[in-house]
Amino acid sequence: DSDSGETAVVSDYVAQQTQQTLETLAAVDARFKALGGELTDEQIATADRYAQQMMDQYGDTYTANGIGLETIKAYERLQVEHTALLDMVYGPDGETPVEDDELTSHLDDSMYEICYISIPLYNTSTYAFANDDQKTKMLRLAQTAADSVNAAGGETVSDQVSALHEAAQNALPDIYAVLDGETSDDSASVQTELLTESDVASTFTQDGAADALRSLSYGEAAAVQINGYTLLLLVRVDPLSVSSLDDLREQVLSDMKGSELDDALASSGAELAHSLNSSAMNKLPAKKIVNSSANS
């Protein structure tokens, strides 16, 4: 492990992870049934259809590793059960429901709804990347556009998005011109996304970018360079002005309680009696696992 410095024999690691996964999946099924869960015909059909798609796409790899369609179907059905457990445990009628005010607080403090326009820090025709001076100029022009959005003072999300789109249309030709580029018909298209802290950490990797997003109030626009090749002209909006809490409940619960549920399932699975043959798993060297992508 590059962070902890710990080392492990690969075959031991594979055996351990295989057993933990099987134990956790068994715990998912046990918990689902204990809470009275039963998959609907539609859920089963959806899981089976996805399993067939996976088999169609990766069948050679699965077959080489001794995995058949029925195993994939069982796995996909367990994934449906796992998703359902989140609501069965933490939903409004769940075992330990999370109150609406807790969900709203998590939305406010740890999730970020943004309307944004992505600006490449390279010429899209020649793929010549901007140097530091060019990036600085592009960022300055984009921030001027963001300032105009803030000056417009839109009170609704619709107003804010309209102001963002208009500002982008006005600014993008000059921004693209820094790299001798030209805009396209969809350059000023506004996209919307609800980000978790994990999303922010993995996407806003440029120094200071994540904090720049976190510092924004609802309705506030900014230009943020998120990595070495992308600049966002964005406005942070109130998620509950875009969607209802019920519409967002599953996504918020997943971010808020997903890890807690997974930890509980892993712990429960480790305590379940089973007849898994750990010595048999240890006989499968990691080098015998077929990885088609490694051979392509």
Annotate each PLM feature.
Residues 43-46, 132, 138-151, 156, ...:
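Solvent-exposed loop/turn and edge beta-strand elements of beta-rich ligand-binding domains
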Residues 19-42, 183-184, 197-208, 213, ...:
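Extended amphipathic secondary-structure runs
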Residues 12, 16, 20, 25-33, ...:
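Solvent-exposed, polar/charged alpha-helical surfaces in well-ordered, non-transmembrane soluble domains
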Residues 1-69:
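N-terminal targeting/tethering segments
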Residues 27-28, 177, 278:
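Intrinsically disordered or highly flexible coil/loop and linker segments, enriched in small
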Residues 144-206:
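Peptidyl-prolyl cis-trans isomerase
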Residues 63-137, 199-296:
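PPIase-associated folding chaperone regions across multiple families
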Residues 22-26, 38, 79, 151-158, ...:
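Residues at alpha-helix boundaries and the short loops/turns that link adjacent helices
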